[in-house]
């Protein structure tokens, strides 16, 4: 049986840990609110951009001069998966679930005979994927050095993807990230980024124009060539913002659970401490009484 001193030290240690997890929970809650606000602020722009792209892509998808970013290369032999996770842990199964989705997608594509390359955005995803798929990882990016996720962040990732596409390194690009459903629910998903026509069909309901005819100036092709990179960057930014919100939600839930578990452990240790102390006092009293009777 542990001594009273050992029990007291352990209770103090658990209380210190509880204070840390409670503080981390409060920090995650504050960051979650900011992340949700950022994601909600970006949503109207992304939706309107998708609607515009849907209209333009309808006019251009069947024309010979359509951009490969829009219609693809005509093949689907090589895939690029952009796996987005967090740089830090202590957020429950958030990172593990995204990596699990990425593994499933990689294995499914390889089973079909596809060539697969991976870009890891986030340290935790890279650390886990390199155990089994180190040869597939072509680039790793960490975001911990950036205080907030901005358009510049998505442009940096988008430029890398477009450079690889222009060099013929892949035919289809998918983003593997977390869809923020609620504080306690983050759903891993794989979303097509290139060809953009597939991403648009998947991500937006084509609006009913009511018979209206739209003129594009100077022309649809020129506008699409300008908007396609921006649209891709918008999709990437939206995924990054949802990922941050999901990470903070998972971290807040994990730290809340840890804080409650610490409280339960403290109660149990206090009970053991009191019983041990009571047993020790009883033993001492018994020894005193026995000694008195011997006299």
Swiss-Prot record:
Pfam families (UniProt xref): ATP-synt (PF00231)
GO biological process: proton motive force-driven plasma membrane ATP synthesis
UniProt keyword DNA-binding present: no
InterPro entries the UniProt entry points to: ATP_synth_F1_ATPase_gsu, ATP_synth_F1_gsu, ATP_synth_F1_gsu_CS
Membrane topology: Peripheral membrane protein
Predominant place of localization: membrane
Subcellular locations according to the entry: Cell inner membrane
Alphabetically ordered keywords of this record: ATP synthesis, Cell inner membrane, Cell membrane, CF(1), Hydrogen ion transport, Ion transport, Membrane, Transport
Keyword Ion transport among record annotations: yes
PROSITE patterns for this protein: ATPASE_GAMMA
Source domain of life: Bacteria
GO molecular function ontology, one term from the record: proton-transporting ATP synthase activity, rotational mechanism
One GO cellular component, as annotated: proton-transporting ATP synthase complex
NCBIfam families xrefs: ATPsyn_F1gamma, PRK05621.1-4
Assembly mode: F-type ATPases have 2 components, CF(1) - the catalytic core - and CF(0) - the membrane proton channel. CF(1) has five subunits: alpha(3), beta(3), gamma(1), delta(1), epsilon(1). CF(0) has three main subunits: a, b and c.
HAMAP family linked: ATP_synth_gamma_bact
Function noted in UniProt: Produces ATP from ADP in the presence of a proton gradient across the membrane. The gamma chain is believed to be important in regulating ATPase activity and the flow of protons through the CF(0) complex.
Family the entry assigns: Belongs to the ATPase gamma chain family.
Protein name, as recorded: ATP synthase gamma chain
Species of the source: Maricaulis maris (strain MCS10) (Caulobacter maris)
Lineage of producing organism: Bacteria, Pseudomonadati, Pseudomonadota, Alphaproteobacteria, Maricaulales
Gene: atpG
């Amino acid at each position: 049986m542990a001594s009273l001193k050992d029990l007291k030290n352990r209770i103090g240690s658990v209380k210190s840990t509880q204070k840390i997890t409670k503080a981390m929970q409060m920090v995650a809650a504050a960051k979650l609110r900011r992340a949700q606000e950022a994601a909600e602020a970006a949503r109207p722009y992304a939706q309107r951009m998708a609607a515009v792209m849907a209209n333009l892509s309808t006019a251009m998808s069947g024309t010979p001069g359509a951009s490969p970013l829009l219609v693809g290369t005509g093949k689907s032999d090589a895939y690029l998966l952009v796996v987005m996770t967090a740089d830090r842990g202590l957020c429950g199964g958030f990172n593990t679930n995204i990596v699990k989705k990425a593994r499933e997608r990689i294995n499914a594509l390889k089973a079909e005979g596809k060539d697969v390359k991976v870009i890891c955005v986030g340290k935790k995803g890279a650390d886990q994927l390199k155990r089994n798929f180190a040869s597939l990882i072509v680039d790793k990016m960490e975001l911990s050095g950036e205080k907030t996720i901005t358009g510049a962040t998505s442009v940096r990732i988008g430029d890398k993807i477009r450079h690889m596409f222009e060099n013929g390194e892949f035919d289809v690009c998918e983003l593997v990230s977390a869809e923020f459903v609620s504080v306690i629910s983050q759903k891993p998903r794989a979303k097509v980024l290139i060809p953009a026509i597939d991403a648009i069909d998947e991500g937006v309901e084509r609006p009913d124009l009511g018979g209206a005819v739209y003129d594009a100036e100077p022309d649809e092709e020129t506008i699409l060539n300008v908007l396609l990179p921006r649209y891709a960057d918008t999709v990437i930014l939206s995924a990054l913002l949802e990922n941050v919100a999901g990470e903070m939600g998972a971290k807040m839930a994990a730290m809340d659970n840890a804080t409650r578990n610490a409280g339960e452990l403290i109660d149990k240790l206090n009970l053991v401490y009191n019983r041990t102390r009571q047993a020790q006092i009883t033993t001492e009293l018994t020894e005193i009484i026995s000694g008195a009777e011997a006299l």
